[in-house]
Swiss-Prot record:
Gene3D superfamilies membership: Fumarase/aspartase (C-terminal domain), Fumarase/aspartase (Central domain), Fumarase/aspartase (N-terminal domain)
Top enzyme class: lyase
The protein's name in its UniProt record: Argininosuccinate lyase
GO molecular function, one term: argininosuccinate lyase activity
One cellular component term from this protein's GO annotations in UniProt: cytosol
Transmembrane regions listed in the UniProt entry: none
GO biological process: arginine biosynthetic process via ornithine; L-arginine biosynthetic process
Origin superkingdom: Bacteria
Encoding gene, per UniProt annotation: argH
Pathway listed: Amino-acid biosynthesis; L-arginine biosynthesis; L-arginine from L-ornithine and carbamoyl phosphate: step 3/3
InterPro entries: Arg_succ_lyase_C, Argininosuccinate_lyase, Fumarase/histidase_N, Fumarate_lyase_CS, Fumarate_lyase_fam, Fumarate_lyase_N, L-Aspartase-like
């Protein structure tokens, strides 16, 4: 049997828990990450107890000094949980009692439960974590923006269904990857607004009868307000699920960028060369330069999605209020943050060091008859109904395919035989430069519009940094 040493309960039990139960209940191997937040919250709790008349000045000061000492020892690693400690809360109470004695150290637990305590600490940890993740996302966005600025007129094949579609600017494509990541950071900023609500003072579920001030401790801990419902505050983990969703969405957005890089770096595409420092080789094939960062981004996106799915499954059938199932809420979120903190700097470095082959992309831009839409839209500008224009452009592609040439190689007579409206003037749109320049509406791929898009991305980056600072 376990001795139950290091637990915060046991008075009504005749004996300690079984060894198997103690092993199952133990959470210090992951919740120790909350230790700095636990100490900070304990200091705020001591001040609230003092204001409520439950601690003398001397007792408050003694607890604060003991917590300062304990915090320093936690920070430098000289105080760590013991195998007998059930969780971070019990370990830290043991450490505090070692420093200030059982009479004074035992007073701190008044008016709080592990239920409101851990709900608060998890929110505090996440509010810091999302800022780190947001910073990492913005570094990837910045790398995309820098590459876009370095290639303002480079033209590449735009694709749908992974088939040649229309010519676009490389910068346009790169910025298309920046926008989803900016939305992810915007979601993280919104998430912080909803998470800045403190459960402290909710007790186990019903609130406190000791005259404590939840708003005071909320302000002390940097929250915008205290919770309005103590049952909801202790039992709800929608904030964790929301964070896990945004982390998974970031993974998905990075995976799509990674997939492009993997394709572009292949011999068949040949758009980019990977920097040596951001790629790996093969143990048997000496010629290989592998896009491992991009491949790991694809792989880790599945892990992030799994963390979200697992957390939602844990939360889906719990009656109010707190249940021990919620011990399982932290590991998937902690893991998602850890994976993104590994992945985001690597993706920023990979993107920032890509070398693009502009000639190769320009050579492939008209392949696959990507200017067919330009013929159809040119006819529309001449007054031809789009249905007829679409058919005529398709017929031009069929003739060119039959001859094994590009659209620009068709003769004037061939164009005229397809549709009399296809005069020699149609050749003004039969260049990739003309096609790109013509798409000058907001959001389009014309250089003037892409330059504006780059400005929008840079402005959004700065605004988001300010929101999250």
């Amino acid at each position: 049997m376990s001795t139950n040493e290091g637990s915060l309960w046991g008075g009504r039990f005749a004996d300690g828990p079984s060894d198997a139960l103690a092993a199952l209940s133990k959470s210090t191997h992951f919740d120790w990450a909350l230790a700095p937040y636990d100490i900070k919250a304990s200091k705020a709790h001591a001040r609230v107890l003092h204001r409520a008349g439950l601690l003398t000045d001397e007792q408050r000061d003694g607890l604060l000094a003991g917590l300062d000492s304990l915090g320093s020892d936690v920070a430098d690693g000289s105080f760590e949980p013991l195998p007998t400690d059930e969780d971070v809360h019990g370990a830290l109470e043991r450490g505090l009692i070692d420093r200030v004695g059982p009479d004074l150290g035992g007073r701190l637990r008044a008016g709080r439960s592990r239920n409101d305590q851990v709900a608060t600490l998890f929110r505090m940890w996440l509010r810091d974590a999302v800022r780190r993740v947001a910073d990492g996302c913005l570094e990837v966005v910045n790398a995309l923006a820098v590459q876009a600025a370095a290639h303002p007129t480079a033209i590449m094949p735009g694709k749908t269904h992974l088939q040649a579609a229309q010519p676009i600017l490389l910068a346009h494509h790169l910025l298309a990857h920046a926008h989803p990541l900016l939305r992810d950071v915007d979601r993280l900023a919104d998430f912080d607004d909803r998470t800045a609500v403190s459960p402290y003072g909710s007790g186990a579920l019903a609130g406190s009868s000791l005259g404590l001030d939840p708003d005071a401790i909320a302000e002390d801990l940097g929250f915008a307000s205290a919770a309005d419902n103590s049952v909801d505050a202790t039992a709800s983990r929608d904030f964790a699920a929301e964070a896990a969703f945004v982390f998974a969405q970031i993974g998905v957005d990075l995976s799509r960028l990674a997939e492009d890089i993997i394709l572009w770096s292949s011999t068949e595409f040949g758009y980019v060369t990977l920097h040596d420092a951001w790629s790996t080789g093969s143990s048997i094939m000496p010629q290989k330069k592998n896009p491992d960062i991009a491949e790991l981004a694809r792989g880790k996106s599945g892990r992030l999605i799994g963390n979200l799915t697992g957390l939602l499954a844990t939360l889906k059938a719990q009656p109010l209020a707190y249940n021990r199932d919620l011990q399982e809420d932290k590991e998937p979120v902690f893991d998602s943050v850890a994976q993104l903190e590994l992945l985001l700097p690597a993706m920023a470095g990979l993107v920032g060091t890509l070398t693009f082959d502009e000639e190769r992309m320009a050579e492939l831009a008209p392949a696959g008859y990507t200017l067919a839409t330009d013929i159809a839209e040119w006819l529309v500008r001449q007054g031809v109904p789009f249905r007829i224009a679409h058919e005529a452009a398709g017929a031009a592609v069929k003739v060119a395919e039959g001859r094994g040439v590009g659209l620009d190689a068709l003769t004037d007579d061939e164009f005229a035989s397809i549709n009399p409206a296809l005069t020699p003037d149609v050749r003004e749109v039969l260049t990739v430069e003309g096609s790109v320049n013509a798409r000058n509406a907001r959001g389009g791929t014309a250089p003037t519009q892409v330059a504006k898009q780059l400005g929008v991305v840079r402005k959004a980056m700065e605004e988001l940094r300010i929101r999250l600072s």
